[in-house]
Amino acid sequence: MTRVIHTGDTHIGYAQYHSSVRRQDFLDAFAAVVDDAIDDGVDAVVHAGDLFHDRRPALSDLMGTIRVLRRLADADIPFLAVVGNHEAARGGQWLDLFERLDLATRLGDEPTTVDDTAFYGLDHVPVSRRDTLMYEFSSHDASYATLVAHGLFEPFAHADWDTKTVLEESDVAFDAVLLGDNHTPGRAEVADTWVTYPGSTERASASEREGRGYNLVRFDETAAAGDDRVEIRRRALETRPFVFVEVDLDAREGEPAVRERVRQHDVTDAVVLVEVTGDGDPITPAAVEAFATDRGALIARVSDRRTVETDESVDVHFADPESAVRERVESMGL
């Protein structure tokens, strides 16, 4: 039996909303995953890419990541990972550095065996280079095999990578495909193989409303009642609260109504995102944002989705270029 944590899209170094606090949140979320791994005594932590938000992470982000990985190494839990599109560099990868420090293993076409499971890796590959991609992997003698990859795979949203093609053209039969890139968690069965995303560990955009987390994956003959050999369970992470305030104003309402809607929520230490729709009077987003931060919000952003109509019409006339030049020359007495 092999038990691993499957995570990805940690985006360490992302100063969301230009906030140093949010930047630390992304590192803290990764540290929380490692804490759980150590507490649970899993056999490995598998990271499916985009460990960093940028290919040039700041020194503080690198040092913070190394500190977290050292705790994992001290607990004798291997960190297995692939390279995502956000962090991919033209030369050597940061993951290679961590491997030289004995803090990580970069997965590839050779198997990395943990207990009775062989792990393979597929870094992010741009769409333009996939036509010539060969899904060739070295053989293994483990009981189970898993592919870890980064990209937008079918049948999930925004897909541009055919999962069935990968599985059918691969010379290794995989029991599971552990993915990264799509920040929405999901699970599906493709060609009798479980394919899953754990989602991001922190909210990297306003569209990521659901709670964050990771997957706990078990490879065992008794997994999933003995039928599938693979059991995938989702586990939640406690992260920075986001408060979504949706305000649909009627014709007689304005900024006071928006403030009242904000007042109805506990915004302490939260990222507050206010969306205004409907009719009503104009509002001043900065004033509403200040109101939210005065009530304890870490960050507040207001989006006014209403279309402002005006009865005024503006006529735009374009001057003839040659006439404009002649007039300018004459005015200069040339």
Write out the residue ranges for each language-model feature.
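N-terminal active-site segment of His-dependent metallophosphoesterases
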Residues: M1-M63
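Amphipathic, non-transmembrane alpha-helical secondary structure
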Residues: L27, A31-I38, M63-I66, M134-Y135, ...
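Glycine-rich phosphate-binding loop signature in dinucleotide/nucleotide-binding domains
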Residues: A37-G41, H140-A142, V267
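His/Asp/Glu-rich metal-coordinating catalytic cores
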Residues: A44, H53-T196, S200-G213
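Conserved residues at the C-terminal ends of beta-strands
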Residues: A48, G180, T277
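A conserved active-site cap/scaffold subdomain adjacent to cofactor or substrate pockets
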Residues: G180, R187-H265
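Accessory, non-catalytic peripheral segments of nucleic-acid enzymes
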Residues: D227-L334
